[in-house]
């Protein structure tokens, strides 16, 4: 038995598997990576409170990928499972410019999948000192990217180092009176051919902080509190077509000794 564990440990420690295409996302932010033509990826994200977000992404050509996802809360556990929405969310990625030695890749995209549960909450709006009305807020705990553009550049520095920066605008989760343009950036550092370190920051400028000053009932919805979201992760290429990722999210917001943890499993294949 000890020999079996030793063999497994050595295999895991020294396995060197290259993934056939660059990362499509970091922990959550999009990159300029797309799927090769004739390739699909099935992704499963396991989130807090037994949540699960399965996603299917297909490469129509080397620069154009489309996909859809569907969020479920309480999928694991004893509570009744509930879907975030009745219809699936969509993803579209189109890389306009390829990366060169001197210039980054440039991609435009659309992603309607937010993070966490989908919140539908009636909150009071103070019209004047004597009257108020109810407004229904409809948004994810962390808003979807919506329309976005992203630049990605890679360097070979004792393994690949990729840097990604982008802007996004969510035009459909705006009932919190905040449709500001948002900024995000991050990096991925290859530790060896099997393991990569991920680090990212979502400024969450569109998180509804201006509206929060007007509405007392919006406190638990504006989860960013104006600080944005800092996330980190470790990605393991178990095989050429299989990735597992352990992520630590919102580490700048959590006052506890432990972070919000997620597991992401990605399987890719040709068709």
Model regions: which residues?
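Transmembrane beta-barrel domains of Gram-negative outer membranes and organellar outer membranes
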Residues: 16-163, 167-172, 188-271
């Amino acid at each position: 038995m000890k020999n079996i564990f030793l063999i497994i440990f050595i295999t895991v420690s020294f396995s060197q598997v290259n993934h056939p295409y660059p990362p499509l996302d970091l922990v959550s932010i999009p990159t300029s990576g797309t799927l090769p033509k004739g390739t699909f990826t099935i992704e499963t994200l396991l989130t807090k409170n037994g949540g699960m977000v399965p996603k299917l992404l297909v490469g129509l050509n080397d620069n154009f990928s489309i996909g859809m996802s569907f969020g479920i809360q309480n999928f694991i556990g004893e509570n009744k499972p509930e879907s975030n929405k009745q219809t699936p969310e969509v993803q579209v990625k189109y890389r306009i410019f390829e990366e060169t030695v001197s210039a980054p890749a440039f991609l435009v995209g659309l992603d309607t999948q937010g993070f966490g549960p989908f919140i539908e909450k009636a909150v009071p709006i103070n019209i004047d000192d004597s009257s108020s009305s109810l407004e229904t807020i409809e948004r994810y705990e962390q808003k979807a990217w919506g329309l976005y553009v992203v630049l990605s550049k890679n360097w070979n520095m004792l393994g690949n180092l990729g840097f990604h920066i982008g802007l996004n605008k969510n035009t459909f989760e705006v009932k919190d009176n905040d449709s500001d343009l948002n900024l995000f950036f991050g990096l991925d550092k290859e530790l060896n051919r099997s393991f990569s370190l991920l680090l990212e920051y979502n400024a969450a400028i569109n998180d509804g902080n201006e509206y929060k000053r007007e509405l007392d009932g919006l406190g638990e919805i504006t989860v960013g509190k104006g600080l944005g979201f800092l996330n980190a992760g470790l990605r393991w290429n178990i095989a050429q077509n299989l990735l597992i990722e352990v992520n630590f999210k919102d580490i700048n917001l959590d006052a506890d000794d432990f972070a919000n943890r997620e597991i992401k499993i990605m399987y890719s294949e040709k068709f």
